[in-house]
């Protein structure tokens, strides 16, 4: 069982989530340095997240669809609460509370808008060579 204090912190709206809920549109919160190209249709997230660390955790922003993208690292998406729908390599996948999915390097995917009570946790793993 998740600690109520932690759950309340995760459910609290961030300023970006407030904007996305109000505007019903995706707002980019990553700098251009996080991508290897300016192409919106084929954005690739780079190792931007891994400054002095090999694993990066974050709560996925709610209320707007996250555009199609891919990575130069592995990603696990874990549904802590509610539901998340992703389009992975052209196929729609529904994840429910407790589900997780491992996304390989270069896997194209997008995430449909999460609702008020949906919590998706992103766990990113840097590839060390």
PLM region spans:
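N-terminal regulatory/effector-sensing and dimerization cores
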Residues: 50-129
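Generic protein-terminus/edge-of-domain signal
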Residues: 1-80
């Amino acid at each position: 069982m998740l600690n109520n204090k932690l759950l309340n912190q995760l459910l609290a709206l961030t300023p970006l989530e407030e904007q996305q809920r109000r505007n019903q549109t995706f707002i980019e919160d990553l700098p251009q340095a996080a991508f290897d190209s300016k192409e919106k249709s084929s954005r690739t997230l780079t190792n931007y997240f891994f400054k002095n660390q090999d694993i990066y955790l974050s709560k996925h922003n709610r209320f707007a669809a996250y555009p199609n993208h891919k990575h130069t690292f592995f990603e696990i998406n874990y549904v802590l609460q509610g539901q998340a729908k992703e389009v992975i390599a052209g196929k729609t996948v529904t994840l429910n509370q407790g589900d997780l999915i491992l996304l390989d390097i270069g896997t194209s995917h997008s995430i449909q808008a999460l609702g008020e009570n949906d919590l998706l946790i992103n766990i990113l793993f840097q590839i060390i060579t």
